[in-house]
């Protein structure tokens, strides 16, 4: 038996979940996504979210309210008379009236092993912290920030050089499988909900602009984790002296190199191996402003780097 659902999500991360629900035969009567955003150099063009584009391609009605706090929006949502709402990286607060409208409630696919990394940036924070594993959890939502009881979970290892983009892709597809499994159990009356532990709670705050600038006085290990966590968006950056002129460059790939540091900011000749506060790091992919992403060997053929800071 198919469930009557609403789907609420915004970025690319949520699209595989939407597709999985459709492939499982569920009736998605409406999709909610954040409003189109200005794009382009002048911000004159409005661009729809990946979820909105995916839903419209399947001829599913899409709603893009700025907020769900108004009585009008809450009445419109309640009128859908859905069995459940599936929420994946929607980015808009769900008030109590929205949470309680579906027959079985609202279910969120969250990219962490709760209660660790509640909040907006769980994938990035897990990599930054050097966590050895993370995962996806399906929880029934309540009014707290990612505090609802857990229906299903699955873990995955965080390898040394995996980027946020690569990990996000793996977790997105994992979440798609889990939500279909959870809804199948829900239909059969077999879904078990387990309260979250009161221990091990941590919060994954949004990434701040000042966190994206590389501080070469930190250890190579810490810098590498930040580069992986912020690749490709928003991307770490540093200033390089190229052809005698300072230039801001995005650093989008790295790996740890052997050897002790012989001086912060020192660059090894013929390589993009940079000495840090402790240890050395090899830059593998980087991007100058207005240019495409290059591997380090290609980059070095067209750029004479004399300093980094």
Curated annotation (Swiss-Prot):
Q: Name one GO cellular component term.
A: cytosol
Top class in the EC scheme: transferase
Q: Which reaction does it catalyse?
A: L-methionyl-tRNA(fMet) + (6R)-10-formyltetrahydrofolate = N-formyl-L-methionyl-tRNA(fMet) + (6S)-5,6,7,8-tetrahydrofolate + H(+)
Q: Which Gene3D superfamilies match?
A: 3.40.50.12230
Keywords per UniProt: Protein biosynthesis, Transferase
Query: InterPro entries, alphabetically?
Result: Fmt, Formyl_trans_C, Formyl_transf_N, Formyl_transf_N_sf, Formyl_transferase-like_C_sf, GART_AS, Met-tRNA-FMT_C, Met-tRNA-FMT_N
Q: What is its EC number?
A: 2.1.2.9
For this chain, one GO molecular function annotation is:
methionyl-tRNA formyltransferase activity
Offer one Pfam family short name for this entry. Formyl_trans_N
Binding residue positions for (6S)-5,6,7,8-tetrahydrofolate: 112-115
Q: Which HAMAP family match?
A: Formyl_trans
Family per record: Belongs to the Fmt family.
Q: What does this protein do?
A: Attaches a formyl group to the free amino group of methionyl-tRNA(fMet). The formyl group appears to play a dual role in the initiator identity of N-formylmethionyl-tRNA by promoting its recognition by IF2 and preventing the misappropriation of this tRNA by the elongation apparatus.
This chain belongs to which protein, by name? Methionyl-tRNA formyltransferase
Source organism per entry reads Bartonella bacilliformis (strain ATCC 35685 / KC583 / Herrer 020/F12,63)
List the gene name. fmt
């Amino acid at each position: 038996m198919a469930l009557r659902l609403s789907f609420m999500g915004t970025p690319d991360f949520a699209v595989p979940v939407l597709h999985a629900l459709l492939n499982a035969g569920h009736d998605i009567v409406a999709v909610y996504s954040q409003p189109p955003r200005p794009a382009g150099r002048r911000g004159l063009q409005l661009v729809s979210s990946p979820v909105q584009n995916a839903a419209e391609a399947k001829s599913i009605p899409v709603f893009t309210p700025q907020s769900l706090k108004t009585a009008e929006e809450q009445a419109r949502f309640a009128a859908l008379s859905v069995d459940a709402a599936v929420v994946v990286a929607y980015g808009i607060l769900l008030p109590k009236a929205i949470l309680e409208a579906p027959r079985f409630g609202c279910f969120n696919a969250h990219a962490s092993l709760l209660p660790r990394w509640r909040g907006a940036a769980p994938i990035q924070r897990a990599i930054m912290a050097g966590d050895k594993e993370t995962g996806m959890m399906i929880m029934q939502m309540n009014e707290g920030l990612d505090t609802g009881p857990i229906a299903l979970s699955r873990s995955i290892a965080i390898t040394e050089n995996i980027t946020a983009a690569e990990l996000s892709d793996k977790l997105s597809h994992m979440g798609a499988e889990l939500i279909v499994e959870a809804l199948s159990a829900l239909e059969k009356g077999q879904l078990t909900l387990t309260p979250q532990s009161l221990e091990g709670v941590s919060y994954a705050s949004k990434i701040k602009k000042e966190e994206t600038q590389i501080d070469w006085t930190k250890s190579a290990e810490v810098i590498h984790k930040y580069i992986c966590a912020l690749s490709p968006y928003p991307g770490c950056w540093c200033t390089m002296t190229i052809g005698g002129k300072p230039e801001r460059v995005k650093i989008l790939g790295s790996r740890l190199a052997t050897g002790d540091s012989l001086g912060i900011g020192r660059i090894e000749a013929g390589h993009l191996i940079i000495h840090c506060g402790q240890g050395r790091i090899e830059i593998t992919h980087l991007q100058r402003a207005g240019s495409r992403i290059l591997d380090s060997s290609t980059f070095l053929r067209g750029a004479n780097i004399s300093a980094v800071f």
